[in-house]
Curated annotation (Swiss-Prot):
Its cofactor is Zn(2+). The active site is at residue 259. Signal peptide: none annotated. It comes from Helicobacter pylori (strain J99 / ATCC 700824). This is UDP-3-O-acyl-N-acetylglucosamine deacetylase. Catalyzes the hydrolysis of UDP-3-O-myristoyl-N-acetylglucosamine to form UDP-3-O-myristoylglucosamine and acetate, the committed step in lipid A biosynthesis.
Length: 295
């Protein structure tokens, strides 16, 4: 199986979630072995996607280098992960990736428009060789060896609409587009009011976020699926795992995970070479599994 990029450049304009200003996003093809590279076109600064360049995980996953930052990269990266794209230039003219509708649907459509192009170099895949776990109180994320990527996520909120939700997701591009891509980010009205008081969430609205008051959902259209809340957490996790720089084969499990815990997990995996092996996708059985997943 070969490395991939996109066939041709595509672009869109949307609003940043926190600053609330228009952002132009451009996706461009890259040659083999270049990886995922972000670029602040307004500053002329290149930000390669690497764990050491993740500078904040409080409200979103934030990439930073020198004086340049790009926030809320996880939804776009989730779609990039699902489409098996290895090499891509992502340019923005402000400090956020556009939030669009709060899910990854728009980015899936954008990648469909761009098309996928095979390159000459063989694809690299990270295979987890032993269990790695990180914790924060009773919250945890872990990853264990497996012959495919699966994500088992549980959330538990003291809210009548959400309560406790769990979903086991076995990755394939088709399953991702059916179950995960449409799941929107969500927040609580009291938190939104606080965030706006400190200059954040200026671009947030019922058009790009599920908003809940103390007892109900404020969005008139309701949920897109029964498990939209936990499926969005899976969407986020796939984006955060893309910081590893390549697709991963392993069983991911999380209880009340977060961007912070996902970032800690990525760094913990890479901290010990015994935790993983980088495979060149030439093993027939594993290549077949990859081709099936990304079909």
């Amino acid at each position: 199986m070969k490395q991939t990029t996109i066939n041709h450049s595509v672009e869109l304009v949307g609003i940043g979630l926190h600053k609330g200003v228009p952002v132009k996003l451009v996706l461009e093809p890259l040659e083999e072995n270049q990886g995922i590279v972000f670029y602040r076109s307004d500053l002329g600064v290149k930000l390669p996607l690497k764990p050491e360049n993740i500078v904040d995980t409080k409200m979103a996953t934030v990439l930073g280098k020198d004086n340049a930052r790009i926030s809320t990269i996880e939804h776009l990266l989730s779609a990039v992960h699902a489409y098996g794209i290895d090499n891509l230039k992502i340019s923005v003219d402000n400090e956020e990736i556009p939030i669009m509708d709060g899910s990854a649907l728009t980015y899936c459509m954008l990648l469909d428009e761009a098309g996928i192009k095979e390159l000459d170099a063989p694809k690299k895949v990270m295979e987890i060789k032993q269990a790695v776990e990180v914790r924060e109180g009773d919250k945890f994320v872990k990853i264990e060896p497996d012959s495919q990527l699966s994500l088992n996520f549980t959330i538990d909120f003291n809210h009548p609409v959400i309560a406790k939700q769990a979903h086991h997701f076995v990755f394939s591009k088709t399953a991702y587009k059916e179950q995960v891509a449409k799941a929107r980010t969500f927040g609580f009205l009291q938190e939104v009011n606080y965030l706006r008081s400190i200059g954040l969430a200026k671009g947030g609205s019922l058009n790009n976020c599920i908003v809940l008051d103390e007892n109900s959902i404020l969005n008139k259209e309701g949920l897109r699926c029964e498990k939209e809340f936990v499926c969005h957490k899976i969407l986020d996790a796939m984006g955060d795992l893309m910081v590893l720089g390549m697709p991963v084969m392993g069983k991911y499990t999380s209880f009340s995970g977060s961007h912070k815990l996902n970032s800690m997990l990525v760094k913990a995996i890479l901290a010990d070479a015994k935790n993983y092996e980088v495979l060149i996708a030439s093993d027939p059985a594993k290549e077949f599994a990859l081709q099936k997943a990304f079909a």
